[in-house]
From Swiss-Prot:
The gene is GPX1. GO terms for cellular component: cytosol; mitochondrion. Its main location: cytoplasm. Protects the hemoglobin in erythrocytes from oxidative breakdown. In platelets, plays a crucial role of glutathione peroxidase in the arachidonic acid metabolism. It is found in: Cytoplasm. This is Glutathione peroxidase 1. The record marks U47 as: Subject to oxidation and hydroselenide loss to dehydroalanine. GO terms for biological process: arachidonate metabolic process; glutathione metabolic process; hydrogen peroxide catabolic process; lipoxygenase pathway; response to hydrogen peroxide; response to selenium ion. Belongs to the glutathione peroxidase family. The keyword Transmembrane does not apply.
Length: 201
């Protein structure tokens, strides 16, 4: 069993994990976000839904961030090589290419990582184990096997860019959404969690 899967198996919540910010510096412990509602997405700057999903991620962070939502983006190049920029190039790609028009993410972006296979970031190994399939499409799979570039291949693999994981204020993953489920449409689920008040976690 690889290190990522061992870490995932031992974890009880996302608070066991950390990730390095896209702009560099010390890793951010997700434990520092205890009590917040987290929306975690694997992102890519050259995907057909980049404009839609990035702008909707910004919108949710803008509207619901003051009430306790934290949006986290993890660039990944495993799906059609649609995040082939270097870490230091991604923000400029977003600003000038897609979405373009001076776009700047107002949510936390982390360094590029893998979400599937032996090299998967331990956070995503944990999320996939906790939520094996998207709630809106339990049969979601990679649509073109020729594009699978990782090993081993598992039934709970992330199928494409912009899969979403909603995590409660106790750090426990609650719901997974497919790439086809629009980010903005998660708002009612987030609102339901926010209305429950602060967690004792």
């Amino acid at each position: 069993m690889c290190a990522a899967r061992l870490a995932a198996a031992a974890a009880q919540s996302v608070y066991a994990f950390s990730a390095r910010p896209l702009t560099g510096g010390e890793p951010v412990s997700l434990g520092s976000l205890r009590g917040k509602i987290l929306l975690i997405e694997n992102v890519a700057s050259l995907u057909g839904t980049t404009v839609r999903d990035y702008t909707q991620m910004n919108e949710l962070q803008r509207r619901l961030g003051p009430r306790g939502l934290v949006v986290l983006g993890f660039p990944c190049n495993q799906f059609g090589h649609q995040e082939n920029a270097k870490n230091e190039e991604i923000l400029n790609s977003l600003k000038y290419v897609r979405p373009g028009g001076g776009f700047e993410p107002n949510f936390m972006l982390f360094e590029k990582c893998e979400v599937n296979g032996a090299g998967a970031h331990p956070l995503f190994a944990f999320l996939r184990e906790a939520l094996p399939a998207p709630s809106d499409d339990a049969t979601a799979l990679m649509t073109d096997p020729k594009l699978i570039t990782w090993s081993p291949v598992c039934r709970n693999d992330v199928a494409w860019n912009f899969e979403k994981f909603l995590v409660g204020p106790d750090g426990v993953p609650l719901r997974r959404y497919s790439r086809r489920f629009q980010t903005i449409d998660i708002e009612p689920d987030i609102e339901a969690l926010l209305s429950q008040g602060p967690s004792c976690a």
